[in-house]
């Protein structure tokens, strides 16, 4: 299904996200004919560029990063325009009014406008207000939609204040809070796996599942983002948004119908059902860590405190592990172990469903565990692990697997997260975007962790290239469980 005809306005068009993700995503949608010809892209930033220079910059980016060439590239670039605007100056937004009118008339886009805030978070409230002051939020001529990047607030209080500020000019149905994790194919397939297969849904509860672990690991450090990262840390950067949303999709009830409101209702219910964290929880079920120098992929790397832009006495966490529970009928008593960190041995995001063992071990006390591994990135796919008889005498069981990889689908075109989410926003499908009640529930849940950090909670060192502090292993071992050590999901076909 194609996107609706519209003008896409990218605020922060001279920034890294526009070059790396947004323009390549729009180009690829154009290449597979999901945009058609009746669209335009207006880049907006303070940098003094014109249409020609902006097109050339984007053209070189697409050649370098996407291997773009030929007529398709030139035609796409002809849809790109630029307007220099001081985004902090309300009066300067007057320049956008005639420019957008001209583009809507040229491309017959009927006033439909998608605003993308690829800017520092300090402008998330300013830009909607400035658009509203010039009437660029009104839907009297076509729809107006606003995509807001993370972080949506710094804590519960600032998130609620930002909502109030944006809602003065844009209604909730116009606001699309983007989380690129939810645009990944495997996350979406999790819902199909659960709700369309009779194998899984009857087992997806406390009666059959022992525990669930969710891992969001990165092998890189903070790179050139030391100053930004030090103000957020692993909890704000990954856990509060990405991983809590993934947890909610693992645990949610079946929606009544597949539409944005029903899906997001169920996500919000899960977040509201998370057992509130007590002081005892944050002291005994939470591990915060910070990497020190070590070896990653055979290369010696510096510690966090040595990174550019990081204060020498920073107590910002680069690792977090938490045991949490959901207080409802389906999940009562099932622990969810969630961890994320930088400078770990591999870049991998996965969900592991650990099923309970048989009531009585007929063949062996050490029979292989039944588990379902859902790999979100990289090497997206699903693997079922279970026990079968080892060839030879006796009845010794060994672990075997049944594996599926998206890369093995002949002719499959798997959209990137930004391609999928941009297309959905242009179609008016908010299913994979966070709603305000879910955002507030997530911030409410993590507030005790923020308080613990502010009070100087314990921070463990871990060597770069390891799977985090040994305290995280002890956390899960207290209940006789272990973290999976992610490696290749499965062997690739040759």
Swiss-Prot record:
It comes from the Bacteria. Pathway: Carbohydrate degradation; pentose phosphate pathway; D-ribulose 5-phosphate from D-glucose 6-phosphate (oxidative stage): step 1/3. One of its GO terms (molecular function) is NADP binding. GO terms for cellular component: cytosol. InterPro entries: G6P_DH, G6P_DH_AS, G6P_DH_C, G6P_DH_NAD-bd, NAD(P)-bd_dom_sf. It comes from Aggregatibacter actinomycetemcomitans. This is Glucose-6-phosphate 1-dehydrogenase. Substrate binds at residues 180, 184, 218, 237, 342. The lineage of its organism: Bacteria, Pseudomonadati, Pseudomonadota, Gammaproteobacteria, Pasteurellales. The gene is zwf. It catalyses: D-glucose 6-phosphate + NADP(+) = 6-phospho-D-glucono-1,5-lactone + NADPH + H(+).
